[in-house]
């Protein structure tokens, strides 16, 4: 089958590989229907994730059709259309019982496109299929479902929930990329008074406003942007600052705009250390949270999609075929130039 694989820092390749097979009774084989590209995939190709070995198929977001199940799988059968979570969970280990699926101790957590082969291919082996797959409601679009693999639960769990967004509060989201916009969509569940989007790209800021942001701030001039945010919050700073970029400058920006007793919720994937101003934060009762998504809110988010509370398909800006995946990466890696947010990649090689 065809698959997009990590080769070495700076290089990935679309190659022929063996089709996956059932290895354990709890496995399923899924024919990928649609997938996408995550910013984390770009980090891997850059070499920021050394645990990813050469030859690993990339990708951890997608939907598909079940081709085969192991004898231990009871919730799914051949022909079922499924949402594939970016996180595998055995459901039985110490961390799974606490709902922390990201750290499942039995071939679980974020392993797709990282520690095992991922979804940017014709077929995928899914460990712990009963807990990793979800049945898809008939009235939801493929595009909406793909967004539910990773970015929607990431923005919600790591940004909104860890940030403790609540009615009437002020929220600044740093980065109007896919995760930042996912946080924006799901923050609206809690009716904050102010949703301030911060970015360098005016086009993305306009998109954020169309998605429900109450204010937009261009941060090309940091000091001016900080002043603007304080002016919007009665000189107090924001109650919640969601970092959705993953670079030192944006984390530092969050530290400078957070108000007393506020929470900095870090969603971004950081490849370098950041300065942590604990000497200034402790006396102002500042909370800082981080996290890797567990996707334990996926059932809740599926219900929100079914009731049309949010429309994550609006994040999709570009469409490609699997045979065009190299072009898809070219566009996504230069997202600002192409006004790209999320791309959809459809399997045109092994169609039903």
Regions found by a protein language model. Give the residues of each.
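Mid-domain Rossmann-like dinucleotide-binding core that forms the NAD(H)/NADP(H) cofactor-binding site
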Residues: 138-221, 227
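Glycine-rich cofactor phosphate-binding loops and adjacent beta1-alpha1 units
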Residues: 162-166, 206, 211-287, 351-352
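C-terminal hydrophobic helical "lid"/dimerization subdomain
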Residues: 252-256, 295-352
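NAD(P)H dinucleotide-binding glycine-rich loop of Rossmann-like/cofactor-binding domains
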Residues: 92-174
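Short Gly/Pro-enriched turn/cap motifs at secondary-structure boundaries
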Residues: 7, 19-20, 53-59, 111-117, ...
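Residue-level recognition of short, solvent-exposed, well-ordered loop/turn junctions
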Residues: 23-25, 77, 166, 259, ...
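Conserved acidic E/D residue at the C-terminus of a beta-strand in Rossmann-like folds
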Residues: 199, 268, 292
